[in-house]
Amino acid sequence: MLSYDKSAQPLGHIYKAQQQGYLPRVYCDETRPLLEGARLTAYELTRVGIDVTLTCDNMAASLMAGGKIDFVFVGCDRIAANGDIANKIGTNGMAIIAKYYKVPVYVFAPTSTIDLDCKSGDDMDIEDRPAFEVTDMYYAKPMAPKGVRVYNPAVDITPASLITGIVTENGILKPREIRNLKKNR
């Protein structure tokens, strides 16, 4: 499996699988620019004895092409009524690659992240993050020329069409089923 981001939701499910005797192997993307995957997810999984291999974000396609990934799992910040999600920048690209290689993508999120008033990802605001996160943050010296413009959005929108299922505390939903929750609330 391949992890992309730092969400606690999927980690809980991995811990539970391990407790039930499954021995998951997790490829953990570094998750730039803040390196949450390297600093947090890999740390947490290693701490409880899960087999973790840290990878650069750009290695996902290579892993999938080589048949090393059974599924991708991510958390998310927000889910729109149509099943689009907002999550850490790079999630959309990861999901596009996964679809190409026929690797399922699961979003692990509590139902509290569902915003039924938000029709689609087009209605979500995307925060711009500071340039230093890309140019300076984890480097002894700045790694980019002084004054270079930086594009650093915090999240991107992954369309529902790229998502296999949304794992909530109430079970697994297809993205198209999110809209129906309104009728049941």
Residue spans for each PLM region:
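Gly/Ser/Thr-rich loops at beta-strand to alpha-helix junctions
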Residues: 1-10, 34
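Histidine-anchored nucleotide/phosphate-binding helix
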Residues: 7-20, 95
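Extended Lys/Arg-rich, glycine-bearing segments that form polyanion-binding/interaction patches
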Residues: 19, 25-31
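Conserved phosphate- and dinucleotide-binding cores of soluble alpha/beta proteins
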Residues: 29-185
